[in-house]
Amino acid sequence: MKDLLNLLKNQGQVEEFDAIRIGLASPEMIRSWSFGEVKKPETINYRTFKPERDGLFCAKIFGPVKDYECLCGKYKRLKHRGVICEKCGVEVALAKVRRERMAHIELASPVAHIWFLKSLPSRIGLLMDMTLRDIERVLYFESYVVIDPGMTTLEKGQLLNDEQYFEALEEFGDDFDARMGAEAVRELLHAIDLEHEIGRLREEIPQTNSETKIKKLSKRLKLMEAFQGSGNLPEWMVLTVLPVLPPDLRPLVPLDGGRFATSDLNDLYRRVINRNNRLKRLLDLSAPDIIVRNEKRMLQEAVDALLDNGRRGRAITGSNKRPLKSLADMIKGKQGRFRQNLLGKRVDYSGRSVITVGPTLRLHQCGLPKKMALELFKPFIFGKLEMRGLATTIKAAKKMVERELPEVWDVLAEVIREHPVLLNRAPTLHRLGIQAFEPVLIEGKAIQLHPLVCAAYNADFDGDQMAVHVPLTLEAQLEARALMMSTNNILSPANGEPIIVPSQDVVLGLYYMTREAINAKGEGRVFADLQEVDRVFRAGEAALHAKVKVRIHETVNDRDGGSVKNTRIVDTTVGRALLFQVVPAGLSYDVVNQPMKKKAISKLINQCYRVVGLKETVIFADQLMYTGFAYSTISGVSIGVNDFVIPDEKARIIDAATEEVKEIESQYASGLVTQGEKYNKVIDLWSKANDEVSKAMMSNLSKEKVIDRHGVEVDQESFNSMYMMADSGARGSAAQIRQLAGMRGLMAKPDGSIIETPITANFREGLSVLQYFISTHGARKGLADTALKTANSGYLTRRLVDVAQDLVVTEVDCGTEHGLLMTPHIEGGDVVEPLGERVLGRVIARDVFKPGTEDVIVPAGTLVDEKWVEFIELNSIDEVIVRSPISCETRYGICAKCYGRDLARGHQVNIGEAVGVIAAQSIGEPGTQLTMRTFHIGGAASRTSAADSVQVKNGGTVRLHNLKHVERVDGHLVAVSRSGELAIADDFGRERERYKLPYGAVISVKEGDKVDAGSIVAKWDPHTHPIVTEMKGTVTYVGMEEGITIKRQTDELTGMTNIEVLDAKDRPAAGKDIRPAVKMVGLDGKDLLLPGTDVPAQYFLPANALVGVADGAQIAIGDVIARIPQETSKTRDITGGLPRVADLFEARRPKEASILAEVSGTIAFGKETKGKRRLVITPNDGSDPYEELIPKWRHLNVFEGEQVNRGEVISDGPSDPHDILRLLGVSALAKYIVNEIQDVYRLQGVKINDKHIETILRQMLRKVEIAESGDSSFIKGDQMELTHVLVENERLSTEDKFVSKFTRVLLGITKASLSTESFISAASFQETTRVLTEAAVTGKRDYLRGLKENVVVGRLIPAGTGLAYHSERKRRREMDKPTRVSASEVEAALTEALNSSGN
């Protein structure tokens, strides 16, 4: 009996392991796995259904078909366990062994493994230094390869076709060895001496000059070193023994009607066995060479198809013309082993049902149908029934439950008390898509969901379904309650703002009760306290909207945790006073003394959470909801067709527009305007008309006339149902109301261009047939877009999760002093995001000083909370260096200080938080809200005039930032740098707006000047680029000869003459190489030098420049010598929305990217080559000049003799992130990418915290490229993991050796995921075959550091509560390590001990 118990016990012993290694299997290893050789292609006997002996399902090899029963039935039952039947040869064991026992096939001729042959780069090809084509010709018996040339003139590895082979045979006889097929390849691989080759390559690489050659050699070297280090032998890439999968993993299932369903693998194996047996027979018969060769080739093809069908040639198809599923197909793709069964599994104790509203639930509850609860909690009920003695055995309990006896329901209620369940709605786009609730038993069959969590789930009640899961163990229940309970997830992890916010009906109810109406019943009364208001309202003596005075008692908490009680009389309305009753103590009355629109309610909940804490907020949110529902019911707001009031002015506006359009049409007909201008003007007109109609409509809707209590007619905000819905933010928007009651406006054609004739009707009037037809396109496109968007957005999320999955908070502080410089985010002069918002929840990296002093006001290491934000804004600080995930120096993972605040909890992030996944979810989840389209700039948008001045919006003080300028005689400043900015600060010194100043801008104010709102402080000509002098002197023309390099032209209007420089291709031969310039000379006739340099002040003039000064003229500082006309910039399409975000994360190089200066120095133009300009930058430090060829059509922002700094823009265009990283560094890159991505999301009104984008960026910057290898084992140009290089460099510097130098590399998220250290994670992401091939050849180890790898091997993930488990395991293992001591050490210690005791 004891034996029996042990038998059941030893099934699940746990193997402790820390890493998984993948490698090539040697033939010996394959034989050692095997339980016998499969010799026949038969599967099962069609009459008896018993497996055939030696066949693919043979019971002798793979084990019995039934538990503990041999095939012939001689031995049955457990007592014969382990006996091998002498009659049928089957071991008596569990049938389960048929899932684990493998067999093998001895191949009659070796076969190359297709993965190592065809998966690029071909590993066999690299090792043998042959092209894939050549190897294939050998393998598929088209040519011979020389294996051993002997004393002949042939070379090893040389290919010979039939003719050449026979010629060689005649010439040399048996002196050489040349063969074909996989055996030849195997011989060659076997003959490679790795050590010798590695040495040879290491010597050869430094001596080669060509880049491509070096690349090829270092690839080969890497592969050889990998083979040497991993213990794999090259010849193992050619199979001599083929393993056979256990039969239960490729089942053969009898269907009714005598047919069988079989796994495709059986067909593939059958082909291999058939061909192999035939080949054996042919070899025994010593058949003619040509027949044997053909059979060998067929065997090679059969094995190829088994391993990876369709990789070479046409895929082998089954009876139904469908390609057979090979071993490779089993593991790759969405339906493969990795993604289907290892990363996503189905779980028991779960159910799903439709959801409905549960308006009476509390926030931590959900309604669970009794039927579902009974099924889900069955084991608990059985246990309880037995414990109570209501049932004697589990079987009896089961019967009771099946009969649904009354006591079962009592027990159920007891079992589910405080036992949380998890509710999940697919698609689970972020972690709030699964939350825990306490179940409340309900009748009916639908799950009831609390309305406030709908926003987090993105759920609505139009037929959505949700799944319920039961956490079984105590630990699981604890985690569900502590971490996943809906009441613990009030803030969104994406932006730290409340996600439990009322919407729709609740908002409408709260808005309705806090509106005021003129002359309502009870207006002007004064109440002693809130109770009195309540009584009077219930008695019907005062209306809900009446303006009254109320004495209130409030307790206001301040930031420091203290509170102040005060009593005051406020002017308010009855409704607001009633609402204040549910507001928790600690908040001021002012929070409700306003119409509660959606934004205000959200702010209120946020404030409540920050001031009075979680528990109060949860209770308050529930109360708000109940109140909102109650009052929206009382309000009786509904929509009737008469609520859509069409403005009377509509007809007049449309008629006027139609007249103007006719006017433009007639101008076009008489040729005064072009087609394009007409189109733009018409579109412009109609857009204006549409805006006017909607303005008229909204002003109509939003006001109504009433008589106040003095009998005077006054305007008050309207109580129109539709207006209230839109105004409160409950439902609808001005744009939607415009289509209902205004006019629908302009529509787009399928190609995206706008149709000139708008739809003047609205939905209330109804559309004509033509109007309806025009509008169908847009509607259908919208639906098609949505479907595409969902797929694209999901794919983006998947890539993001994959790149960031192993990023976990692993320590408190990495001790770095680096960080990112945070400044307010400015767009078009306005501050879009003030500094306070950007630093909230971050840790300060370096002390912040009070402006203009040495006093530290915020010490480094401070976590900035709301209190500090106020403080920073009070002290008008405009830049702060904060810690960031990008600059964190933690080796594996990230530290809590660099990450800062956990946005969903409001305090510093805990160790073990999976911040990478949270970042990926936060960015991916709103993906479906982004647009898919590319904005074509057309119509009204393309004609926005180029900016030509800075007009300030707010009064304040002028500040100039890194602006190089010269002062003109009239006192104005002229900008002579490209990156200057002008900012306006308010009286507190806070920056309100900031503008870029182009080169040549004339600035009419100076640093520190006060300006009023609306004043123009700088001006420039947007259509020309001036060349400004920085000194005064006399102009001298150089190389400017009329008719050769220049031409004079007279302006017809003004009569002024201009000199225009001719383009080189328009000049006569004499002028081709002359470079016209304007030189400055002093009074003594000597050349003037540019200030601070020894470069003569001469300005070379590019083609088409207009010179405005005469030869010999005197000019002053800041005068314009010449103007270069700017071609009006081509209207570029702005890629918006989701595609733009994907491009940024994939780090794609844009087309026609902007060109940046590679070094700091002086610009010059060298000799032009065909269609390109040669730009030369001479560095100021005297190093070698840098040259670059730039296409002629690119417009350059720089001119000869100008100073540029490294990374400055030379030619405009979209920025290339790789250039920014290379020239300006990591923080500039971070700033660029964060701002670009935020712009896309901000356009859709989505808030995401910067740190999530930085977290993904950290993962994209994991790799470095080796620039100099030093004494390390790295090869120049290798891409290595940053941490790996740093560890190696530390080791080298302790040994006083030369460390390697490297540059940071930016990888796109797909590439970064595939180049991760973990091959399991990479293989389960994409390109499974390639990843596994590479990992096997190099014998990679996966140390299971990320989350994904651990899910795949079925362990707790090293994040959250799992991190503690992993670190505890590590600690235990360190303790258990045996310490090895040598005998001599023991002896020495003993003598020492004896001596000391002797003394």
From Swiss-Prot:
Keywords: DNA-directed RNA polymerase, Magnesium, Metal-binding, Nucleotidyltransferase, Transcription, Transferase, Zinc. InterPro entries: DNA-dir_RpoC_beta_prime, DNA-dir_RpoC_beta_prime_bact, RNA_pol_asu, RNA_pol_N, RNA_pol_Rpb1_1, RNA_pol_Rpb1_3, RNA_pol_Rpb1_3_sf, RNA_pol_Rpb1_4. Disulfide bonds: none annotated. It holds the Pfam family RNA_pol_Rpb1_2. Mg(2+) binds at D460, D462, D464. DNA-dependent RNA polymerase catalyzes the transcription of DNA into RNA using the four ribonucleoside triphosphates as substrates. It comes from the Bacteria. GO terms for molecular function: DNA binding; DNA-directed RNA polymerase activity; magnesium ion binding; zinc ion binding. The gene is rpoC. GO terms for biological process: DNA-templated transcription. Its cofactor is Mg(2+); Zn(2+). This is DNA-directed RNA polymerase subunit beta'. Zn(2+) 2 binds at C814, C888, C895, C898. The keyword Lyase does not apply. PANTHER family: DNA-DIRECTED RNA POLYMERASE, DNA-DIRECTED RNA POLYMERASE SUBUNIT BETA. Belongs to the RNA polymerase beta' chain family. The RNAP catalytic core consists of 2 alpha, 1 beta, 1 beta' and 1 omega subunit. When a sigma factor is associated with the core the holoenzyme is formed, which can initiate transcription. Zn(2+) 1 binds at C70, C72, C85, C88. It catalyses: RNA(n) + a ribonucleoside 5'-triphosphate = RNA(n+1) + diphosphate.
